[in-house]
Amino acid sequence: MSKLFLDELPESLSRKIGTVVRVLPSSLEIFEELYKYALNENSNDRSGRHKKPRIDVSSDLLKTDEISETNTIFKLEGVSVLSPLRKKLDLVFYLSNVDGSPVITLLKGNDRELSIYQLNKNIKMASFLPVPEKPNLIYLFMTYTSCEDNKFSEPVVMTLNKENTLNQFKNLGLLDSNVTDFEKCVEYIRKQAILTGFKISNPFVNSTLVDTDAEKINSFHLQCHRGTKEGTLYFLPDHIIFGFKKPILLFDASDIESITYSSITRLTFNASLVTKDGEKYEFSMIDQTEYAKIDDYVKRKQMKDKSMSEELKAKSKSKGQATDGTADQPSILQEATRQMQDEKKAGVFSDDDEENDQNFEAESDLSDGSGQESSDGAEDGEEAEEDDEEDDEEEDKKGQSALNRDNSFASINGQPEQELQYKEFKEPLELEDIPIEIDNDDDEDDEDGSGVEYD
């Protein structure tokens, strides 16, 4: 039997077969038959025989795959699409004329802008997400493996107007005319998605969901920046999303290795997510009030918080001391949060301060040079500014006087001045009463003869 077929195989596989043949020479014939069979099957696939029908998602297919009322599962008109393109389009679920499989497409009239086939394999993740500060809107977010002609790769993000969607559902006869709960629309869309082969989650309908580990995960979102772009960071049971300005970021929660907090102030902090591949993504200007929720999410997902180790290293470098490695020390972020809570309890920011701030803002609006005030108002503004300058000078003098009093306790050559004065006057002092003459005259010229100098 010829051994020439071994030369056609990968070197590692050829060596393994050779080892078997040396032990069992009769096996060479079996290996050669297997090789010939594989060649025949490969040629059959190329010629189209024994080949399972599949959809070739191309523009030629789309010309024959028409959409009509008979094969439409669900249609929602005038949806505001934000990604991968920005247009008002129609969202359509329908059954393909080619093989009857479900398809999602975005239409502009009769023109297809984006089509996704094989939904059970192509849709990787889909979810409804709230729109911050706009309760009448909701996002529908979807990621996919490929689309028609591979024109796009970015996630699909569209905004649904709750009122308009409710009206469309009522006009289509999908809801009764007296229904006002938008969740009925969400439930219907989710059911259609399940029938077509994928799931759309709705994590914010109930703020608490249950993940695969049977642990309660609170879904929440917060405002932050990535570089110069402001966006929303969504923490979901299995994913973290930042959007919706390009590039949109989607993380699988299980792919996050660690989190690090930095640039911590009394009001904000930064958080950096580090993936298992070593990629780092920093999000800045996060409000301090969001820390507890992030910390709880991180702990439940068993992500590593590397902030403490970096803080201890920084302390050891600045103080020249070795790190003791105590993991129980409160982090800087926790200290800042505690300080902010203490200040609120102590009433550091009083109502008077807020009133002063409002007055200041109001005065700023009137003196911004926009030309909306009359000339008399401008003159009054100038006089007010002069009065303010005089008041500022007087306040400066008072402040300097207070500063001088405070400085009486400052150290001189490392020794407190108070101690020097005490040493200087160890002997008892004899105090002498000094008579003070009181001027009862009611002159108008009291200032000149009062004995008190005014600045």
From Swiss-Prot:
Localization annotation: Nucleus; Chromosome
Residues the record lists as N-acetylserine modifications = S2
Q: Name one GO cellular component term.
A: chromosome
Query: Where in this chain does the entry annotate a coiled-coil region?
Result: none
Q: Where is the signal peptide?
A: none
Q: What is this protein called?
A: Histone chaperone RTT106
Q: Which GO terms describe its biological process?
A: chromatin organization; DNA replication-dependent chromatin assembly; heterochromatin formation; negative regulation of transcription by RNA polymerase II; transcription elongation by RNA polymerase II; transposition
The UniProt record's further free-text remark is: Present with 11100 molecules/cell in log phase SD medium.
